[in-house]
Amino acid sequence: MTTGLDAARKQEIKEIVCDILEIDEDEVTETSLFKEQHDADSLRAIEILAALERTQKVTIDQAELSRMVNLEGVYVVVSEAAQN
């Protein structure tokens, strides 16, 4: 899936997600599920959304949380938000 995000931006997003989920970067893949594999709860999902809005200078509707289940989904949502 093409997101239009460069490698540096993807790395920054990955660092944010890993920091909030309190996991090492090598523990997460683009397709590993935050809730099922990394014990993320809804509060952490909101924290991820807020941090992404702040650092990536985008606005993300909370309805997009259902798509932000893994890094791949986060990349797509951020990419789409950046285009708006």
Curated annotation (Swiss-Prot):
This is Polyketide-8 synthase acyl carrier protein 1. InterPro entries: ACP-like_sf, PP-bd_ACP. It comes from Streptomyces avermitilis (strain ATCC 31267 / DSM 46492 / JCM 5070 / NBRC 14893 / NCIMB 12804 / NRRL 8165 / MA-4680). Residues 7-82 form the Carrier domain. Keywords: Phosphopantetheine, Phosphoprotein. Acyl carrier protein. The modification O-(pantetheine 4'-phosphoryl)serine is found at residue 42. It holds the Pfam family PP-binding. 4'-phosphopantetheine is transferred from CoA to a specific serine of the apo-ACP-like protein. Gene3D superfamilies: ACP-like (1.10.1200.10).
